[in-house]
Amino acid sequence: MQVSRRKFFKICAGGMAGTSAAMLGFAPANVLAAPREYKLLRAFESRNTCTYCAVSCGMLLYSTGKPYNSLSSHTGTNTRSKLFHIEGDPDHPVSRGALCPKGAGSLDYVNSESRSLYPQYRAPGSDKWERISWKDAIKRIARLMKDDRDANFVEKDSNGKTVNRWATTGIMTASAMSNEAALLTQKWIRMLGMVPVCNQANTUHGPTVASLAPSFGRGAMTNNWVDIKNANLIIVQGGNPAEAHPVGFRWAIEAKKNGAKIIVIDPRFNRTASVADLHAPIRSGSDITFLMGVIRYLLETNQIQHEYVKHYTNASFLIDEGFKFEDGLFVGYNEEKRNYDKSKWNYQFDENGHAKRDMTLQHPRCVINILKEHVSRYTPEMVERITGVKQKLFLQICEEIGKTSVPNKTMTHLYALGFTEHSIGTQNIRSMAIIQLLLGNMGMPGGGINALRGHSNVQGTTDMGLLPMSLPGYMRLPNDKDTSYDQYINAITPKDIVPNQVNYYRHTSKFFVSMMKTFYGDNATKENGWGFDFLPKADRLYDPITHVKLMNEGKLHGWILQGFNVLNSLPNKNKTLSGMSKLKYLVVMDPLQTESSEFWRNFGESNNVNPAEIQTEVFRLPTTCFAEEEGSIVNSGRWTQWHWKGCDQPGEALPDVDILSMLREEMHELYKKEGGQGIESFEAMTWNYAQPHSPSAVELAKELNGYALEDLYDPNGNLMYKKGQLLNGFAHLRDDGTTTSGNWLYVGQWTEKGNQTANRDNSDPSGLGCTIGWGFAWPANRRVLYSRASLDINGNPWDKNRQLIKWNGKNWNWFDIADYGTQPPGSDTGPFIMSAEGVGRLFAVDKIANGPMPEHYEPVESPIDTNPFHPNVVTDPTLRIYKEDREFIGSNKEYPFVATTYRLTEHFHSWTAQSALNIIAQPQQFVEIGEKLAAEKGIQKGDMVKITSRRGYIKAVAVVTKRLKDLEIDGRVVHHIGLPIHWNMKALNGKGNRGFSTNTLTPSWGEAITQTPEYKTFLVNIEKVGEA
C-alpha cells in the first residue's frame, strides 16, 4: 500500500491521529494499513428495550455523542447524536444478549427513510402535502378541536345529570409508548371529556383481561418468560411464539432441554410445531370444543389435584337452583336485547350473605358437578367431528395433560392472538383457565396462563386505562348510570361473600381517590365527591369498530391517531377508508409516514381513491421513537423496565407528551379568550410540571407512583411518610385525600430510594428465574401471581423444588414477594386475594356477559351450516353485529375456505415495511395454501392468486405447503388459507414490494364482550390470476 506523506495528511484532514502517528515515526503507509479503531470505542452507550413485542428484549444503543435531554448537557450546540449501532444486552435476564430479526433490524427503523421529519398538512381535496410549522399545526388543530368540542360537548344529559362528555372527536392511542406518556395521555383525554378512546389492546388482547380477571382476579400474564423453563408440559394453543416471540420462546426450549414436552394445537404446522413433541391440526374457531373435551377427560378419569380443587377453587360452592343451560342458551336470555339477565348465575347464600359450600363436593348444585354435567357432551367423537382432531391424537394429548395433575408436575399454557381474535375469545381463555385450576397449576412456578403480549407496552397502556371503559388500575370509567361518587364506588367495589378473605378490591375507594387527587389536585375534595363530576360519563362502548361506524354515519368528526396505523390494523379496510374519508379532520402522531396518514392518496388497485373527493383535513405530526426518549415499558410478565434516551430525534420530531401538552396550552388560551363549553372540567385537570409544555418522564413516573400529601401516620401513631415523600406501596393509599397515585398498581416503582424500574440486578438465587432485583413488577414487585396457591393450606409446598415463597413468622416473602397477606399457615384465607371468594373460579358466576362456563359456538362465518351441539343456536347469541355489517357476512357456498391471519418472525405488522433489513428478509406478500387445495384449484408455487371475502379482495403470491392439511369437519372437507398480515399499499423506496392490506378481507364484528375483531376465522375464496 503506497501513500505519500502529503496524501496521508490530506486523508486524515490534518487530524491529530495522523500527525501524532507520523511524529511517533510511523510511515504513512503503515499507519493507514493498521487495524482501524473499534467502532464503538468512542460511542455513547445507553440501555433500552426493544420496541416490538412484549418479550421486551434488552438493547444496547450506540450513538455518535450524548443526546440532549433536560437533565444533562448536549454533545454540542450545533450537533445531534445519531444512532449507528444496536445490539442485544447480555445482562438482560430474559433475552441475554439475543435479538430476533425485528430487533436486529431496529436500527433501520430508527434511521428509516420513511421517518416523518416535520409537520405536514394536507388540505381538503388536495393530492399533496404542505410543510407547516409546529406553531401553525398546533394552532389549527387546537382550533378544530375547540370548535368541535364547543359545538358537541354534553355537560348534562336529558335527565339533568352531569356527564361532561365529548363524543364527536376520538383518539386511538399507541401501545408502544411509555407508561409515562400513557399516563399523560389518560389525563389529557379525561381533561377534554373525550369518550371515543381506544388502544391497540382492544384489537388484540381485549379478551385476556375479560377472561383472566373473572377467573383469578387479575387480567394479566400470571408468571413470566423465564419461568416457562420450569414447566413439565407446555401447551401452545392460540399462538406461535417461536415465530412471533422467538427470544422469549428460548425458555420453552430450555424447558424441553430439562425434559419437558411441547404440544402445539394449531391449524398450521408452524415454527413452534416444528420443535414440538406433538402437533394437532385443528379447525380455526373450534378451540373451546377441544378444551372442554379435555376438561371432560380430566373429570371422568379423576386426573385433577383434589386438595387444590377443594380448597383453592369454587368447586364446592353451591349454584342457584334456577341456573340451567338448555339448547345453547344459559338461563336468562333476552332475545330482543341479545343479552342475559345473570341473576341466576350466582351462588346460594346463607342468612349472613355468605356463599354456601359443600366441602364433600357431593351436592348436585356444587360447581364441580354442574361443570361435569356441562362438559359431558364434549366426547372424543364430538371433538373430532367439530375440530377435525383425530380421537387417538386428542386422547394422547389429554393423557399428557392429565399427568400434570400430580403436585410435583406443572403445565403452562402459552397463547396470544390465536385465542383472543375470535368471536368467542374470552371463553377460549376461560376454558384453559378451568383446566389449570383443576390441575392445580395456578400460582406454581412452571404453571399459570401466560398471555404473550404482542406490542412492547400493550400491557402498560392497558394498565393505564387507555380503553373505552377504563381508568388506570382496571377501574371502570363511570357511565351515565352512575349518579354520584358514593353510588359509583359502591357499584364497583366487590362485597365480602366468604368470611376471612382478603378481597383486596375492597380498597377500591383508596385507589380511586388517590387517582383523582393525581388528576385534579386541590380541585378534588370530599365535598365534591373527589371531583367525580369532572370525569366524563360514557354513554356506550366506543370500541374501534364503533369508531368506524360513527365516522361513516357522520357522527365522529375528528380522529387522533397516536402511533396507531388504523388503516392497516382495523378490520374491513374498505369500511375504515370510507369512514376516514368522511372525517372533518385527522391528526396523525407517528414516527413514520404511515398508510393511515395517506389514506386519501391513490395507490392504484390496493387503495383506489380520488383525493379530490376527500375533504378531510389531515395533519402529520412527527414524533420520537423508543430510542429517542426515556421512560418505562411493561413486558408480558408485568416487569416495568426503564430505558434511557439513546440519540436525538431527527428533524423536528417531538415526544408525544410535548405535542399533547402544546395542544392543551393552545386550547387553554382559546378558552381564556373566547370562553366555551366544558371549561370547568378542562381547567380542573392538574398540569403542574416544571415545563408544562414538555413534562419529563421522571416527573410523570413519580406522579404515576404517588406521594403523601400530608404527614402520614400508622394506626399506632408512628410517622410513615413526611408530606411530599414518595410512597412505597399501595397498602399505604388512603381515601381521605392525603395520598396520590396515578395508578395504584405502580405504587412502589419510584420511591425515596430511587427509580426501582431501573434496577439491574439479574441474580437469581432461586434458580427458578425469579430475578426480583431486575426492574419492578406490578403488583408490589411480585413475579408469580397467586403464589400462595403453590403451597397447601398448612404452608407446605406442593413441590419443594418449585418453592418461591415460605412462611418466615411474619410473612411469606422468600425468593419472591408473596402474592398474599400476612395470614399464617392453616388460615382459611384463600390464595386468590383479588377475588371476593378468595379462590379461583371454575364457574365465573355473573362476571362474564356471555356465560359462566364456556360453550362452543361457531364463528360468524362458518364452513359448516350448523352447530352440532345445538342447531337452533349456532353462533354466540350475545354477539353485536351492526346492521350494515350483516350485509357483509359471507356464506360457505360462495366462500368455502377458512382463512386465518398471522405474523412472520421477520416483520412486525406493517411497521417493519419501513425498515430496509426486514424488507430484504421478507420482501413480497404471499399466502399459504395446502397441497390438496392447490391441486384442486390448479395453483402452483409462485402463482399470483386472488383471495376474496365478502368485504373485498387482495392479490399475493401462492406458497403451496405441507404445513396446512385438509380436515374433515361434520362430514365435509375443510381447507385453511394462511394470510400473513405485514404488507400494505406503500413500500420503502426501492426496497420490497407494494401489497394489499390483509384487513381488506377481515370482518367488522368482534368478540361479544370486548369487541376484539374476529381476525382469525373468516371465509374466503381463492383463484389463480397469474402464472409463476
From Swiss-Prot:
Record's keyword terms, sorted: 4Fe-4S, Iron, Iron-sulfur, Metal-binding, Molybdenum, NAD, Oxidoreductase, Periplasm, Selenocysteine, Signal
Record text on cofactor binding: Binds 1 molybdenum-bis(molybdopterin guanine dinucleotide) (Mo-bis-MGD) cofactor per subunit. Binds 1 [4Fe-4S] cluster.
Gene3D superfamilies: 2.40.40.20, 3.30.200.210, 3.40.50.740, Dimethylsulfoxide Reductase, domain 2
Binding site for [4Fe-4S] cluster: 50, 53, 57, 100
MF (Gene Ontology): 4 iron, 4 sulfur cluster binding; electron transfer activity; formate dehydrogenase (cytochrome-c-553) activity; formate dehydrogenase (NAD+) activity; formate dehydrogenase (quinone) activity; metal ion binding; molybdopterin cofactor binding
CDD domains documented for this protein: MopB_CT_Formate-Dh-Na-like, MopB_Formate-Dh-Na-like
Swiss-Prot/TrEMBL GO biological process terms: anaerobic respiration; formate oxidation
InterPro entries, per the entry: Asp_de-COase-like_dom_sf (IPR009010), Formate-DH-alph_fdnG (IPR006443), MoPterin_dinucl-bd_dom (IPR006657), Mopterin_OxRdtase (IPR006656), Mopterin_OxRdtase_4Fe-4S_dom (IPR006963), Mopterin_OxRdtase_prok_CS (IPR006655), MopterinOxRdtase_cofactor_BS (IPR027467), TAT_signal (IPR006311)
EC class (word): oxidoreductase
Signal peptide: 1-33
Highest taxon of source: Bacteria
GO cellular component entries: formate dehydrogenase complex; periplasmic space
Main location: periplasm
Subcellular location(s) of the protein: Periplasm
PROSITE patterns in the record: 4FE4S_MOW_BIS_MGD, MOLYBDOPTERIN_PROK_1, MOLYBDOPTERIN_PROK_3, TAT
Entry PTM: Predicted to be exported by the Tat system. The position of the signal peptide cleavage has not been experimentally proven.
EC number(s) given by UniProt: 1.17.1.9
Self-association state and partner proteins as the record states: Formate dehydrogenase is a membrane-bound complex, formed by subunits alpha, beta and gamma.
NCBIfam families: formate-DH-alph
Homology family: Belongs to the prokaryotic molybdopterin-containing oxidoreductase family.
Protein name, as recorded: Formate dehydrogenase major subunit
Native species: Haemophilus influenzae (strain ATCC 51907 / DSM 11121 / KW20 / Rd)
